[in-house]
Design a protein with these regions (language model features):
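Active-site neighborhoods and metal-handling regions in enzymes and metal-associated proteins
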Residues: 1-168
Length: 168
């Protein structure tokens, strides 16, 4: 995998940009978007080799800035962390919707706004779920050097002949 990161890094640099070193692609398994194996955007010494049948999101991140991102105080993406319950009835309705439609996959407050008309109810429910550690919050990321960031993604299946691009 470290070799693949080197190829991604070279390609990004050939266009005059910097790869973002602390963001990666990742292995995907059924119901689990980030399955524990990262695909770097820079060359590393990681000796792991792709195996037939595995699925990966290859996600080159490029920037005009520093090549490193950090969190800002804004959250737009969440994911289910535990199957505990909440006290408020509206929070339970929202939690049940998340479980039935998203499971462990990430979701956004914007997605909930399409399902539930009250932004205040959604905000209170999300705060309750965060406090009870039922969901995780993912802060928005920003280039540390204030550069512009781009990202693209292809999902690939590793086959006996190489790979098959699943996103087209």
């Amino acid at each position: 995998i470290g070799f693949i990161g080197g190829i991604i890094e070279e390609k990004i640099k050939s266009f005059g940009f910097k790869p973002i070193s602390n963001l990666t692609g990742h292995k995907i398994t059924t119901g689990l978007l980030h399955a524990g194996i990262d695909v770097p955007n820079i060359k590393t010494d990681d000796p792991y080799e792709f195996r037939e049948g595995e699925i990966y999101a290859i996600e080159p991140f490029a920037t005009t800035g520093s090549g490193f991102v950090s969190d800002i105080d804004q959250v737009e993406i969440f994911s289910l962390y535990s199957f505990n319950t909440v006290k408020m009835r509206q929070s339970r309705q929202i939690l049940n919707q998340i479980i039935s439609e998203r499971g462990l996959l990430p979701f956004s407050e914007r997605w909930l706004n399409k399902k539930f008309p009250s932004r205040l109810t959604i905000s209170v429910a999300l705060k309750e779920m965060l406090r009870e550690q039922i969901i995780r919050a993912y802060p928005v990321l920003k280039d540390s050097g204030d550069g512009l960031v781009s990202q693209t993604e292809h999902t690939i299946l590793i086959t006996d002949k190489g790979n098959e691009v699943l996103t087209k």
